[in-house]
Amino acid sequence: NSAHPCCDPVKCEPREGEHCISGPCCRNCKFLNAGTICKKAMLDGLNDYCTGISSDCPRNRYKGKEDD
């Protein structure tokens, strides 16, 4: 049972100096750069992009409500 390299095993949060543990916009314990595609476009033709400040992949703000 090996500990996750990004995770402080005592506090269960990113180690000091690291940004994140996992997520579509997290790689090697760091947030991916803003503008990195985290979800490729489907029928709507709009990709979703990382923000550079979160490990989540936010929905493209230009997608309409019907694109859910």
Swiss-Prot record:
Compartments reported by the entry: Secreted
Keyword annotations of the record: Cell adhesion impairing toxin, Disulfide bond, Hemostasis impairing toxin, Platelet aggregation inhibiting toxin, Secreted, Toxin
Family matches, as Pfam families: Disintegrin (PF00200)
Tissue: Expressed by the venom gland.
Domain of life of the source: Eukaryota
Primary residence: secreted
Cystine residue pairs: C6-C29, C20-C26, C25-C50, C38-C57
Keyword Lipoprotein: no
Example of a GO cellular component annotation carried by this entry: extracellular region
Locus of motif Cell attachment site: 42-44
Family recorded in the similarity comment: Belongs to the disintegrin family. Dimeric disintegrin subfamily.
Function: Poor inhibitor of platelet aggregation. The disintegrin inhibits the adhesion of both the alpha-4/beta-1 (ITGA4/ITGB1) and the alpha-5/beta-1 (ITGA5/ITGB1) integrins to VCAM-1 and fibronectin respectively with almost the same degree of specificity. Inhibition on alpha-IIb/beta-3 (ITGA2B/ITGB3) is low.
Name of the featured protein: Disintegrin EMS11A
Organism: Echis multisquamatus
Lineage summary: Eukaryota, Metazoa, Chordata, Craniata, Vertebrata
